């Protein structure tokens, strides 16, 4: 790997436009004394897909870079290479991947270290990404897998000379802080971003043009290959079973969910399905699962998809241990191998086994756990930064890439079989947008989980604020409401045998004690899960926009209007799809402040289960309101005025051949339109450009609702995917 040399601090800069007119530039910083020995390990060299060049070409063409590329400079130091990037005096900065502790990064230092327990606002993250977005309408990616430190206008050089004392008439008392919060508050003090990339003497900087802030994010996602498009069933409800369940108990849970009319598409099995779990054998535990093929067949008969928990550390009893030993790291984790997924041999062995043992037997997804790093607090369980891998990476570089590499290895199994997966992964890095893997965490702070939904949209990531243990009935329902309005509606009940709506107290649940009056709570939970099922067509169309246009499914308000200063600090509201404003209520709140963005009016969402007492209230945009929530069915979700919102009949599962009966809710009196995405919901045939279509819905007060296919001569692969049964004027 290239190292900084003390003989010269000079760095040369070479800027090129990646594709003419498409708004992406690369600035290469290298030592003036010549090419460094070796090449830096980068995310771009291990990306899952090439750039979506045709989609980039459909964006607004950009002739000039959004910042002066010559102003991006570097210098070598003993610690590595230091990069300086200009930042305007009024610009604010967001991004850096899955940041759970803060939204705006201006004035802060962030070190992007992979960490399974990011408990402070330091930059540690399950999925850090060295990519930031400016309110001036551009994005910057520092293409490194090192634990880079970003200083966002937080430091500057001292004054070049002393200053005379103030004249008597000009004297002002010095400000003295009276509390530590004010004393150490982050402040902007310079006009540049400094990025320290340790150990390296060369680095590439990618600049993504807008012209808007959202356009810059879209360009980054499209340059990554376009956003993930999950199978339709992946947007249903997920339920991970108790970790100690055996085959009989898993089948009992499945039948119980169906009998109770609790919507569910995916059942996840936790560590107990394997003979060895820490590290993994990837062998069925025949004592608990004597006939997995029969279990899979029965679950499929009930229209469940099956998702298996695992991690990539390979136990000595695994059938693939010997084949992976030469292509693994030099240090073990839980006595298991750490495969080097940068090597095709390691990927082929690992994927080949999983394909034959599981995917060919109708396992349709995996939960890729423990692929981030140790928590740095209780146990250094993962491989250290000084580990060495046969592909040339050290442990630090591998930690940055491990989640992406692992997910790509598993994703390719399904791509080769032309069958979509939607899975989970606990780590990620740059260029991850195409990967159909959703991030999650063992942490559980409710506000952090909400912030994760918002921040993931800056960097081409998907995040699930999963539901696990709950402190009360209210806590369960409020967490369920947030998770059904996220990229993945996941109930992770691995710690309790009974569904949490029958007993939220973990100890009592494990003791088999039903909660008095559990039926009422189950009914409330069912209504929340059915809301998700109603929104599946809307969400699927939003994911299609993510894939084809790069528009995040969940995004911060500041992305839509960075000039509205109110948006810049809002880290507890987000836009879901094109038209929904979501402001989740935290446990314990009976009222909350909601900001309604300017530019249009907003109408409170309403259906038979939610906001029934308030009704479809209309509010002008550009104002704060106090939303009263006297009961758990009060849900602050607002619809942009003059929107068509397709709501499906709530089915018990989406399945592989759904037919959605749609009622189109009409919000507002002016003309409104919506495009529903149509394909088979299962395959990757949409990638060939001919196996999908858009169903355009239009509402005019005079003529009512009409629909048409937007691409003439191309019928959708499933002509019966949507059946419009009516329209409802809500407000």
Model-derived regions, located:
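Accessory, solvent-exposed terminal regions and/or long lumenal/extracellular loops of proteins
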Residues: 637-731
